[in-house]
């Protein structure tokens, strides 16, 4: 196994929290993600552990959305808030991010909050790194417009 579970738990939790916007639900999904990962028949031989964890977590988040049909408002700020605070108030950023599609918001959160490598995000979204870079630039451009800022991240 290329990475330890402890190293990735916080990243997967933040990802789940950003997706479902409810602390307890994110904790449950994160735990279920790691249980399913460990139950995977060949988890010791998986080269792309992070990608598998995010895929499992994403599927569980989608299942949760299907159950509830609506996402709850966040109870408190996600753990990756240092970036938000250094650029602008968390409230302004949350408003701007809310204007993005779910997939665009997920891409930005994975890249800039969870610091997931581009190649992993590209594989999760079935696109090339080139297409992902172009899409991120497009998303950041829209965020700049929404915020009226010259620099964002």
Where would I find each of the regions flagged by the language model?
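A short pre-motif secondary-structure segment
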Residues: 107-111
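Arg/Lys-rich amphipathic alpha helix in sigma70-family domain 2
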Residues: 55-75
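A short, charge-rich alpha-helical start-of-domain segment used by transcription regulators
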Residues: 1-14, 18, 27
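C-terminal flanking helix
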Residues: 13, 34, 101, 105, ...
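Structural recognition of an alpha-helix C-terminal capping motif at a helix-to-coil junction
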Residues: 14, 28-35, 39, 47-59
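DNA-recognition helix of helix-turn-helix
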Residues: 119, 123-151
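Acidic, proline/glycine-rich intrinsically disordered inter-domain spacer in sigma factors
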Residues: 67, 73-98
């Amino acid at each position: 196994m290329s990475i330890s579970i402890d190293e990735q738990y916080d990243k997967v939790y933040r990802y789940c929290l950003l997706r479902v916007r409810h602390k307890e639900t994110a904790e449950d999904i994160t735990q279920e993600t790691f249980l399913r990962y460990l139950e995977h028949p060949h988890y010791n031989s998986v080269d792309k552990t992070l990608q598998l964890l995010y895929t499992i977590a994403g599927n569980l988040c989608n299942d949760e959305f299907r159950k509830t049909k609506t996402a709850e408002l966040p109870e408190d700020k996600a753990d990756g808030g240092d970036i938000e605070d250094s650029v602008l108030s968390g409230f302004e950023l949350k408003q701007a991010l809310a204007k993005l599609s779910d997939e665009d918001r997920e891409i930005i959160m994975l890249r800039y909050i969870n610091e997931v490598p581009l190649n992993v995000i590209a594989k999760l979204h079935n696109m090339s790194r080139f297409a992902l870079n172009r899409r991120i630039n497009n998303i950041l451009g829209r965020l700049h417009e929404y915020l009226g800022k010259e620099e964002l991240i």
